[in-house]
A protein has these predicted regions:
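Key residue(s) within conserved catalytic/signature motifs
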Residues: 1-182
């Protein structure tokens, strides 16, 4: 399969996203939310922006409209991809254990909210460490379908990327107005 059609337009948006990537390469991560109606090109814009940031590694996660999706599905995808690229094989077991146990893996002396916060911090620290070398673009696609735990963790990560080499590109669908055409 060859490259897609040439990307045209959206110069202002690409410049803004390139600025985020440049800042992340210097240790000032950032977040971009890309929203719009279905089919408007949100994913293509995010893909193009990520491809134009060759100094940063890229990882993609996509939410799916499936109620059977496991909790933290977006981050299971991200951690799986990041671990293949950034951590040695001997650490794979620890990663799999973390994913299998989730928030319940924390000491029993913590209440559920404290356990969740500890896991969120661990995920942010893990991704920040993985991005410390080359930097990292994390593309979260179709988050309108994300499970609630993934959304909480994504918000936590977004609030803490400022001092990292991480760029979060988050695409989401804005529903068309009911009964209207635009």
């Amino acid at each position: 399969m060859g490259p897609g059609p040439e990307f045209v337009g959206r110069a202002a948006e690409l410049a803004l996203l390139a600025g985020l990537a440049d800042a992340a390469a210097l240790g000032e991560g950032g977040v971009a939310l890309i929203g719009g109606e279905p089919g408007i090109g949100k994913t293509r814009l995010a893909d193009e922006a990520a491809a134009r940031a060759p100094c940063l590694a890229r990882v993609r996660a996509r939410a799916v409209p499936d109620e059977g999706c496991p909790p933290y599905w977006l981050f299971r995808q991200v951690i799986g991809e990041v671990s293949k690229t950034f951590i040695p094989n001997e650490l794979q077991h620890a990663r799999l254990s973390f994913l299998a146990q989730g928030p319940q893996a924390q000491p029993a002396r913590l209440d559920l909210a404290e356990q969740r916060f500890a896991v969120f911090e661990a995920v942010r620290d893990y991704l920040t460490a993985a991005a410390a070398g080359s930097g990292l673009v994390l593309l979260f696609d179709d988050v309108q379908w994300a499970d609630p735990p993934s959304l909480r963790l994504l918000r936590h990560l977004a609030e803490g990327v400022a001092g990292s080499r991480i760029v979060l590109l988050i695409t989401y669908r804005i529903p068309r107005p009911a009964g209207g055409t635009s």
